[in-house]
Amino acid sequence: MSTFLPPLAPGSVSLRLYPHTSLDARAIVEEMRTQARLAREVGFDGVMTSEHHGGFAGYLPNPLQMAGFLLEAMDGGWAGACPLLLTVRPTALVVEETAWLAARFPGRVMLGVAAGSLQDDFDILETPKEGYVERFKSALPQVAGALSGRDPWLLGGDPAVAACAHSPIPMTSAAMSYTAVRRAADAGMGLLFDSLSTIERCRELTDTYRGSGGTGTCILVRRVWIGPPPASRQAQQVDVYRSYAEAGAQTHWADDAMLSHSDPAELAEIVANTAAAAGCEAVNIRLHVPGILPEEVRDQLAALGDVVPAVRERLLAGLAV
C-alpha cells in the first residue's frame, strides 16, 4: 500500500507493536520489522512503540530507536515512540533525537510522550521519581515548542530542530486527567487514551480538551481481535497494569475494553462507533497480550485486512458530518 494518512491525522488507523520476549533480541527486532511491513500491507497508516525498562512486561527501553528500525522496513507509512517517558531523560535529547529521525524520514515521524509511573523505570535510569510530575510539566511545552517549530528553545542552532519550523513533527500526550488534557491543549499536542479507560471517561476528557482550546487529534487505543477474544490472556495483561498504575486511574478502567467480532464489517463498525462515542478522531489498535505468538499476530494482521480500511472510511465519514 503506497498511500497513507499523515502521522496522527484525523481518520488515521495505527497499530501498537510490542516485542515477543520469548525470542532473542535479534529475532525480536526482525519480527517487529516484519509485523510493521505486514501492518502497512493491510492498510494501517502507521505504527507506534512504547517504553518501559528492564524487560518489563514486553515493552522496549528504546522506542524511538525501534521506530527508526521499523521505518526502514516499511513501504511508506509512519512510526514513532508513543508514548516515550519524558521524565527519565534530558528534554533536549528527546527533541534532538526525534528531529534527526524526522530528517531521515521526512513526514513519517511522530512523537507521543508520557510522565511515567513505574518505579523501576526511574531506578534503572538512576532518575528520582520524586518531582516527576513537575519535570513533565516543565518539559512538555519545551518539547512541543521545539518540534512544532514555534520555539526552538536552546536548540535553534541544530539543523534538524530548525527544520521543524517548516516541517513540524506531530505530537500527542498520554493524558488521563482533566489537568493533563488541559496541559496538552496549552502545548498544542493531541491526546492518546489508554486501552483500558472507559468510553465515558475518554469522552469527558475529550470534551474538556476541546473546551480548553485543544485542536489536536484525539486517539483512542483499543485491543481489537477477529474471532473469539483471548480473554484469559487479556486478564493477565490487566493484572500487570494493576501492579503499578495509580489507584485513581484504575477507577476509570472498563471491565472489558477489548473489541472483538468474527465478521470484519461488524468489527469495523464497532471500532469506529467506539471511537466516535469517545470523541476521538483516530484509532490505535493493539493485538498484543501476554504469551501471544508471532504467528498469532501475523494471522490477526491478515484478518484485519478488511477491517482497517473500513474503520478509516467510517472515521473520515464521521468527520465530514
Language-model-detected regions and their locations in the chain:
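Conserved, mostly hydrophobic/aromatic
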Residues: 39, 43, 51, 70, ...
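Structural preference for beta-strand elements that scaffold enzyme active sites
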Residues: 10-16, 45-46, 78-83, 108-112, ...
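Internal, glycine-rich beta/alpha segment that forms the wall or movable "lid"
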Residues: 2-11, 90-190, 199-207
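An alpha-helical appendage that flanks or caps ligand/catalytic pockets
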Residues: 2-9, 41, 125, 130-160, ...
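N-terminal beta1-alpha1-beta2 module of alpha/beta enzyme domains
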Residues: 1-74, 169
